[in-house]
Amino acid sequence: IILRVCNWEEYIDTGDWSDDDIIDLESGSIKGENSIITDFENWYYENYGKKVKVQYSCLGTNEELYNMLTLGDDYDVICPSEYMIMKLMAEDWLEPVSDDFYDTSIANNYYAKGVSPFIKKTFDENKINGESWSRYAAGYMWGITGIVYNPDKVTEKEASTWTIIDNSKFRRQITIKDNVRDSMFAAVGAIKSDKLKSASFINSPDYRERLAEEMNDTSEANVDRIQEYLQSVKNNAYSFETDSAKTDMITGKVVAGYQWSGDAVYTMDQADEDDFQLNFAVPEECTNLYFDGWVMLK
């Protein structure tokens, strides 16, 4: 059996840990010796008596993944973000999970037994064409977006707003995400910064509804405004990237970068090993909550 899997980089344990990588816990220690791929192949054979070979590859962005699929790349299981899951559901790309997938009485239903209640609730409540995300997807990771910054060069106040991406003080010293969803979200936050941070807006009784409306405005005028803004920001940014900002921050090539929270933690941990402090700020205007989940392609 060949199982073709496409996932984000650094989303699974690939094994071969050194002694320096050991995680010490009160109950013992953790050291990854085997790749989770090898462990899964062995586990599958032990439980089902069949040999499975995992062909594992990584994606750079959701848009890159979608283009790969439309060009004919063939996978069995992929791990896109929620907005791409919704698109794939709407376009009938996906197989639903089995009827007993969430049955906690089944011994091997580890997901149903261990899934975060927050993720389960989110995937149950959000729907496309009347069907919940959980009918097709198993939530895997979630997080927020924000700004990783060097506190020796950037103040917390400067990093706590989306307008940092067009701040000329940091010209060619800041990175921005190279994907449609995240770059446009940051642009909207920057363009509408004054309004989103105003007391009258924040204290309005329907704040959440108004915020969602502002951040999801797809009117032609707003989209044109976003495109113009991002074109101008290109002259201020060091790069539009998907993964290189982690290294660029650690090596000091840039002083701030727009990052997903998981990458932010990794970046700060790596910098800390070199006695180099980096911080993470969530923009005051609002932030982007994301979910990545496993789905099966037809």
Where are the predicted features?
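A bilobed periplasmic-binding-protein/Venus flytrap-type ligand-binding module shared by bacterial periplasmic
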Residues: G146-K153, G189-A190, F291-K298
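Hinge/lid segment of periplasmic solute-binding proteins
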Residues: K51, Q55-Y66, Y83-W142, E156-T163
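Alpha-to-beta junction loops
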Residues: L71-C79, W93-L94, F170-R172, T251-Q259
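Extracytoplasmic/periplasmic substrate-recognition and gating elements
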Residues: A271-K298
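Early extracytoplasmic/lumenal segment of secretory-pathway proteins
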Residues: I1-K87, E91
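Short helix-loop capping/hinge motifs at secondary-structure junctions, enriched
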Residues: D152-S160, K192-I202
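Short loop->beta-strand "edge-of-pocket" segments that line small-molecule binding or catalytic clefts
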Residues: T163-V180
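Ligand-binding pocket segment of bilobal, Venus flytrap-like solute-binding proteins
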Residues: I176, S183-A187, K195-N279
